Amino acid sequence: KEIGPNLSEKYKDVETYDLKGDLVVPPYVDPHIHLDYVYTARMPGANNGTGTLFEGIQRWSETKGNMTIDEIKERARIALKKEILYGTQYMRTHVDVTDPKFTGLKAIMELKEEYKDIIDIQIIAFPQEGMYSYKGGDELVEEALKMGADVVGAIPHFEFTREMGEKSVKKTIELAMKYNKLIDVHCDETDDDQSRFVELLAAESYLNGIGELTTASHACAMGSYNNAYAFKLFKLLKLSKMNFISCPTENIHLQGRYDTYPKRRGLTRVKELNDAGINVCFAQDSISDPWYPLGNGNLMNILDAGFHVCHMMYVDEINNALDLITTNGAKTLHIQDKYGIEVGKDANFIVLNAKNEFDAILERVGVNCSVRRGEFLFKREPEVIDTKITLLK
């Protein structure tokens, strides 16, 4: 298989597909989603009236007990189909393991195997109700890793006390090193400027030499830190080489809920992280669950929202925007050695309905086709508009 100009003339007896000069990029990477939660927003008892993170966790805790493996898989399949048809071929999903039955984990592990030929999925052992605030949460995380989860998760800002939060961060590092796993922590997902677990996570990962294997998801509190502290923090973040994930639509929805006016946007310092050369990427996070009732798995929508909210409209930023849902996400998943369009790597790519990066962002274009290991996952026919009005043709 080959990509290049005039292949139909070079290989007259071989099927060729004319990309018509459209933009070829690596597949989208969604580095933060919760597949076990998708399409639960309208279930009885799941409605989040305050729109806060903490009510979302409460609603999930109260409704998750009756879920079955088959029901979770049925919902997650819908989300996976949407993400794949929007161009995603790599994904990292958190799965709630504060459930002694491991219902969600078993369901998503089965789906990971079922979909392995069309999308790569990393699974995070995520203690949604706390590693220590939920009795035996640390043991459940460890058991999930033994069962096959790929990544260690935590949620230190949700623990009952600061000390318990710090303990959970250190336990995450310990488990990752013990089982040779990656790390992805829900970190400082709050407007509280005193929530500073990202500092501890960066320090511990740096001192243990695993910064590049570590990710801080959300880090919303960084948007509320005073600049003197943030300036000091950035030195450590650069040293650690830790990754960051921002979820623009989710963060702007959940944060700022305790403000009157002015209201905070609730995102981490994406622009500043990017300008400092610290790896940062965007993600979907939720698809219609107790935290966020909308979402459809289209990362182009996430990118558009993120660039607006983060004041990243400089022309060069727009020209490089796709990095935030492609190469930066791949680095976060630590798959950069096999990801990308290069000789010797799998022929995985998507074709966007645009001629260049700027126009792709400008029009929020769709994906014309997706190719994986040299085979088409799908082709999309161009949009046809039927009109008799000359000015609209």
Where are these regions (language model features)?
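Histidine/acidic residue-rich metal-binding segments in metalloenzymes
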Residues: 103-117, 134-243, 260-282
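Alpha-helical scaffold segments that flank or form the walls of functional sites
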Residues: 24, 41-94, 103-114, 139-146
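Active-site gating loops and adjacent loop-to-helix segments of metal-dependent hydrolytic enzymes
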Residues: 39-72, 148-151, 197-215, 220, ...
